[in-house]
Swiss-Prot record:
PANTHER family noted in UniProt: SNRPN UPSTREAM READING FRAME PROTEIN, SNURF (PTHR14508), SNRPN UPSTREAM READING FRAME PROTEIN-RELATED (PTHR14508:SF2)
Domain of life the protein comes from: Eukaryota
GO aspect biological process, one term: mRNA splicing, via spliceosome
Purpose of the protein: Plays a role in pre-mRNA splicing as a core component of the spliceosomal U1, U2, U4 and U5 small nuclear ribonucleoproteins (snRNPs), the building blocks of the spliceosome. Component of both the pre-catalytic spliceosome B complex and activated spliceosome C complexes. As a component of the minor spliceosome, involved in the splicing of U12-type introns in pre-mRNAs. As part of the U7 snRNP it is involved in histone pre-mRNA 3'-end processing.
Example GO molecular function: telomerase RNA binding
Residues annotated as domain Sm: 4-86
Keywords of the record: Cytoplasm, mRNA processing, mRNA splicing, Nucleus, Repeat, Ribonucleoprotein, RNA-binding, Spliceosome
Organism: Gallus gallus (Chicken)
PROSITE patterns with a match to the protein in the record: SM
Name of the protein: Small nuclear ribonucleoprotein-associated protein B'
Length: 240
């Protein structure tokens, strides 16, 4: 039975092969692949070449270069021989198995979340937040209630304090503003700008009773000399 050329080449896959080129260079590497044009792929390849000395008396010296992965064209190939057997660790899986015990240097994927038995990190004392139930408003104040209930409760709590002044809710009425002595009563217009308001009677005394007899009411000009003034309020004028 005749063995084909491709079958012979397949038998030497993963072998260390020595390839000699037309220019005399020698490539030694692990044989990985080929095609019908005898293009070869060698990995971990080393190049060896002989350099002729300038002086004929000196011998030729051999130079080695490390190349790594090489694609060798078949048109430059002269001969190909076996240099050594394939490495022994070719069939060993380099990826750790699922059940294998992990050691230093074995990479593992980081899981999401915090393990169940891991202790929770504690914040420093100065950066920790307030403890629930200690400090801050009470739960009754923070509980949502109807409109006006919270304001009424706050006003009742404030009024229970001894000596606390009465507080008025903004927008719902407040204490009447203080009235000055010369300000007009509510609903009446004041004097024009630049004019001094008339002087009224003292506080607590009804108007018209604090003025002396014969004096006109406040805001009226006195009568000319020789004429009697108007009678005081409550008295009839004299008959002519």
């Amino acid at each position: 039975m005749t063995v084909g050329k491709s079958s012979k080449m397949l038998q030497h896959i993963d072998y260390r092969m020595r390839c000699i080129l037309q220019d005399g260079r020698v490539f030694i590497g692990t044989f990985k692949a080929f095609d019908k044009h005898m293009n070869l792929i060698l990995c971990d390849c080393d190049e060896f070449r002989k350099i002729k000395p300038k002086n004929s008396k000196q011998p030729e010296r051999e130079e080695k270069r490390v190349l790594g992965l090489v694609l060798l064209r078949g048109e430059n190939l002269v001969s190909m021989t076996v240099e050594g057997p394939p490495p022994k660790d070719t069939g060993i899986a380099r990826v750790p198995l699922a059940g294998a015990a992990g050691g230093p240097g074995v990479g593992r994927a980081a899981g999401r979340g915090v393990p169940a038995g891991a202790p929770m990190p504690q914040a420093p004392a100065g950066l920790a937040g307030p403890v629930r139930g200690v400090g801050g408003p009470s739960q009754q104040v923070m509980t949502p209630q109807g409109r006006g209930t919270v304001a009424a409760a706050a006003a009742a709590a404030t009024a229970s304090i001894a000596g606390a002044p009465t507080q008025y809710t903004p927008g719902r009425g407040g204490p009447p503003p203080p009235m000055s002595r010369g300000a007009p009563p509510p609903g009446m217009m004041g004097p024009p700008p630049g004019m001094r308001p008339p002087m009224g009677p003292p506080m607590g005394m009804p108007p018209g009773r604090g003025a002396p007899m014969g004096m006109p009411p406040p805001g009226m000009r006195p009568p000319p000399p020789g004429m009697r003034g108007p009678p005081p309020p409550g008295m009839r004028p004299p008959r002519p």
